[in-house]
Amino acid sequence: MSIKSDKWIRRMAEREGMIEPFEEDQVRYVNERRVISYGTSSYGYDVRCADEFKVFTNIHSAVVDPKGFDEKSFVDVKGDVCVIPPNSFALARTVEYFRIPRSVLTICLGKSTYARCGIIVNVTPLEPEWEGHVTLEFSNTTNLPARIYANEGVAQMLFLESDEVCDVSYKDRGGKYMGQRGVTLPRT
């Protein structure tokens, strides 16, 4: 399994629509204003989060249960900035829509800018032939409110290509998050 370069990422985005919308270079300024970088890097792609968030509040249930998650546990927020309460989390989605090739597994890592502030980004791998907007989870590990900025870089996707194509892809098995759009809550 090998990690893919900026050249490969550009080629796959342009020819195969792997990432839409796509920035072929790193973007560090928008309208002469400094932003947290996003776009193509040497061996990855830095994604942005959209301006729709679901902020977790612990007012409706005593237990968090992935098999019976209560949607009322979230407050919907739309805006350029999302404030996450201390020791809580928020869900968001990428601006970018992904179409992962059959021979590729994509890993997401948080950006150091957020990690250095105690904000952790978590995403499970994007499996072969999965497509959709990526649901992002931001954990605020601090005892202070934390800000997340919409339309700026939040995480980096790394593309790993296998030396052998898988027998069964995410699409083949009818994965439950296939084609997701918007922030998607847990499904069982």
Swiss-Prot record:
GO terms for biological process: dUMP biosynthetic process; dUTP biosynthetic process; nucleobase-containing small molecule interconversion. DCTP binds at residues 111-116, 135-137, 156, 170, 180. It is an enzyme of class 3 (hydrolase). It comes from the Bacteria. Its EC number is 3.5.4.13. The active site is at 137 (proton donor/acceptor). Pathway: Pyrimidine metabolism; dUMP biosynthesis; dUMP from dCTP (dUTP route): step 1/2. It catalyses: dCTP + H2O + H(+) = dUTP + NH4(+). One of its GO terms (molecular function) is dCTP deaminase activity. Gene3D superfamilies: 2.70.40.10. Keywords: Hydrolase, Nucleotide metabolism, Nucleotide-binding. Belongs to the dCTP deaminase family. Homotrimer. Catalyzes the deamination of dCTP to dUTP. HAMAP family: dCTP_deaminase. This is dCTP deaminase. It comes from Chromohalobacter salexigens (strain ATCC BAA-138 / DSM 3043 / CIP 106854 / NCIMB 13768 / 1H11).
